[in-house]
Regions:
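Active-site region of the double-stranded beta-helix
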Residues: 3, 21, 28-193, 208-247
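Fe(II)/2-oxoglutarate
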Residues: 3-5, 175, 180-190, 206-383
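Conserved DEDDh/DEDDy metal-dependent 3′-5′ exonuclease domain
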Residues: 17-19
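Residue-level detector of alpha-helical secondary structure
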Residues: 24, 28-31, 268, 360
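Histidine-centered metal-chelating micro-motifs
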Residues: 196-197, 201-206
């Protein structure tokens, strides 16, 4: 396996690692659920030289049979020849893609590095643009990419110390396809369809797509991150239920950190340290990027006002003293028990779908309308 303790700190490109056509087929199969992906708010669109503009995305029923169809469709929808589309949480839409990463990467990662992983967060970038709208940047976690093609892309990478000595620690300005990459001079790596790329955390990088192409990505989630996420979500959901606490405002990250650190009845005092504050910061920006940013797509509101779980999944419930443990989509929530909370999850298990109106009606048996609406918003962001 190409990942081991000796080379974990280095950029790795393994040529022709995978048969890209097989994953490309899985990707197009996933895109048959394009409407569902849009409704889930797990899609971001960048055009007009890299500015985010989800208003461009319309809900047209379309079958994507090949690359040309998809590129033609998106160019027409966005009214732009250069654009970037980012899709998050692909593991919810394609079992084949998810199984590929589990079989080929997760087990090998744990075996070679001795690091237990909860799993991977899967995503995709596709489009045609000069430099990625995120500019030259470093990531908080290791990044794994599999390039599907059909055309090559170009990857620019800088060791952190070298880049920061030239440009400082700040990433380049976001929302711009024209990031100047000439100052920290480096030759691009040509990445062909089927190539596997490993970018260690902290390594600055940028991607160029002069021709249309699709890339799948995975962010490893260490088991420790799972424990942090559980506490984070438990605290927020419990606060919403008991105090009508509203997390879904655009608040400065320092204010969010301060508020979370004050929730001592859920999060242990021992976690109040620099590492924990860094984790809060990372989680905040992850949520802001992929979860709670308002998606401005013009969609049917009735479709947004419902929660769905896959037909083959069940929400597991377990009572523990005054709490209800809820295992949903890989996240364990510890919620203060109430009959209405238990009723709504049992309803969702039976019907696989619950509308906002039905859920509010159930929750309002024991809480205010304001609190019930916030519970709906939070639970929906994790389904």
């Amino acid at each position: 396996m190409f990942l081991n303790k000796e080379n974990i700190s280095k950029l790795i490109i393994s040529n022709k690692f995978v048969k890209a056509k097989e994953l490309e087929y899985a990707f197009y199969t996933m895109l048959k659920q394009f409407d569902n992906i849009i409704h889930s708010k797990k899609i971001r669109v960048y055009k007009d030289n890299g500015v985010r503009d989800d208003l461009s995305l319309q809900l047209n029923k379309t079958s994507f049979l090949n690359v040309e169809d998809l590129h033609k469709f998106l160019s027409k929808e966005f009214k732009a020849t250069d654009y970037c589309v980012a899709i998050s949480e692909i593991e919810k839409y394609s079992h084949k893609i998810s199984d590929f990463f589990i079989s080929n990467i997760i087990h090998e990662w744990s075996k070679n590095l001795g690091e237990q992983l909860l799993g991977f967060e899967l995503y995709s970038f596709l489009g045609k643009y000069k430099i990625t709208p995120f500019g030259i940047h470093d990531d908080k976690e290791h990044t794994i990419l599999v390039h599907l093609g059909p055309n090559p892309m170009y990857l620019y990478c800088w060791e952190s110390e070298f880049y920061e000595s030239i440009a400082g620690k700040e990433s380049t300005v976001l929302g711009n396809f024209n990031t100047d990459i000439s100052k920290p001079g480096v030759s691009p790596h040509k990445v062909e369809p089927g190539d596997f790329i490993f970018i260690p955390k902290g390594m600055y990088h940028a991607i160029e797509r002069s021709e249309f192409s699709i890339t799948l990505g995975a962010i490893p989630i260490p088991l420790t991150a799972r424990k942090f996420s559980e506490r984070f979500i438990q605290a927020k959901l419990s606060e919403i239920i008991t105090n009508s606490y509203n997390f879904f405002n655009y608040k400065p990250v320092d204010q969010i950190k301060s508020e979370i650190l004050n929730i001592t009845h859920i999060i242990e005092d021992g976690l109040k340290n620099i590492d924990f504050e860094n984790e809060i910061t990372n989680e905040y920006f992850r949520l802001k990027s992929n979860g709670f940013l308002v998606n401005r797509c013009l969609v049917n509101q009735s479709v947004l006002d419902e929660i769905k779980i896959s037909d083959y999944k069940n929400i597991q419930l377990k009572k523990e003293l005054a709490y209800l443990l809820v295992f949903i989509n890989g996240i364990e929530l510890k919620i203060r028990h109430s009959n209405s909370i238990e009723e709504l999850f049992n309803y969702l298990n039976s019907n696989k779908t619950i509308t906002k109106d039905i859920m509010i009606k159930i929750l309002c048996k024991e809480m205010s309308l304001e609190a019930a609406e916030k519970v709906f918003t939070l639970i929906k962001s994790y389904t």
